[in-house]
């Protein structure tokens, strides 16, 4: 994760993030809202409403507290801009 503005350890921020091919973040939540814009590859997302394949130029908004899974496309992974309303966290859900 390369932070472009703000401070990911203490508050709101925007960062470029890369998921390698087949990356699996597991089922988790974030305390704060997240907004993601995919630059390259595909960001894979799944929540109780279903699955999404978010491609270049596409946008997804994930409300804080939403239980979800995310990962990278099997061939290219994903390069995306991630903006969070507060500090970065990833809270695993068992």
How would you describe each model-predicted region?
Residues 25-27, 45-46, 67-74:
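Short beta-strand His + acidic residue motifs that chelate non-heme Fe in jelly-roll/DSBH
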Residues 91-94:
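Short, charged, solvent-exposed linker or helix-capping segments at domain edges/interfaces
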Residues 1-26:
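A short glycine-rich, His/Asp/Glu-containing loop-to-beta-strand
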Residues 10-14, 31-33, 75:
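Extracytoplasmic
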């Amino acid at each position: 994760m390369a932070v472009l503005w703000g401070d990911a350890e203490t508050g709101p921020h925007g960062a470029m993030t890369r998921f390698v091919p087949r990356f699996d973040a597991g089922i988790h939540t974030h305390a704060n809202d997240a907004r993601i814009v995919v630059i390259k590859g595909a960001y894979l997302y799944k929540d109780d409403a279903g699955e999404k394949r978010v491609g270049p130029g596409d946008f997804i908004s994930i409300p804080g507290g939403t239980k979800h899974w995310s990962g990278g496309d099997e061939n290219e992974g994903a390069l995306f801009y991630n903006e969070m309303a507060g500090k970065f966290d990833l809270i695993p859900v068992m």
